[in-house]
Amino acid sequence: MRGNSRPSFHWVAALLLFNSSLVAREQLNVLFIISDDLTLTALGCYGNKVCKTPNIDRLATEGTLFTRAYCQATFCGPSRASLMFGYYPYATKANGYTSGREKVGPDKDSWPQYLRNNGYHSARVSKVFHMGVPPDIAKGSDGADDPASWDEKLNSRGPETWAPGKGETLQNNPDGTKKLAGGNRFVVVEAEGGDLVHSDGKTAQKAAELIHRYKTLDKPFFLAVGFVRPHVPFVAP
C-alpha cells in the first residue's frame, strides 16, 4: 500500500498547484477542433507521403504531436463521451450512440461545462458529442448532444448520401452494379454546389464568425468545432 499512496499524494498536490495557477493567471480563449473518423495514418505529420494535409501538419510543427493518444473505445459514441466527461467508457456506460450524461448524472461536469461554470462562454458548432452521420447532419438536428455543456450551439445542416449530384456505392460493389446506398456506407457523392453548401464548409464559416464576434465578449470563450468528414458517406463538391 505504501507504494501506491505516495504517488497519489504527489498527483493530488500537482492538481492543487495547477488549479491555483489557473486562478492566478489570465484565462485564455480555447478553440477545440475535432474531426470524425480521421485516422492518423492519413496525415502528413504522422508519415503519410500521399495525402496533403498542410494545415494540420503546421499545427503539429508549431504545437505538440501526440504519439501515444488512444481512443477509449472502438467506435464513436463511447469515445466521445469518454473524451468530453473524462471518464472511461465503463464509467459512462455509453455503450451506444449517447452523450454519456445519462449514466454520469447531472452532478458531474463535462469539461466544457466546467469551463462554463468558471467564467467561460462555452459554445459548439456541429458534431462534438455524438451526432448520427448521415441522419442528424441531413436534418440539422442535435443528435446526442449535452445541453448543459453549452451557452450557445449551432448545427450545420448539409447534403448527405442523397445530395444532388453523381454518386456511387463502393462498398461490396466491385462491378459497379449496386444502386446508391443510404446510411453509414462507403459511398462517394460528387455533390452540386461549393463548400458553403456542405456541412463542414458551413461549420468552418460559422466558427470564424463566432471567433470574430467573441472579440467583444467580456469573458474568455471556449469554442468546440466539429467536422463530420472524413466519416462516410464521402460527400464533397
Describe every region a protein language model picked out.
Residues 10-20:
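Bacterial N-terminal signal peptides
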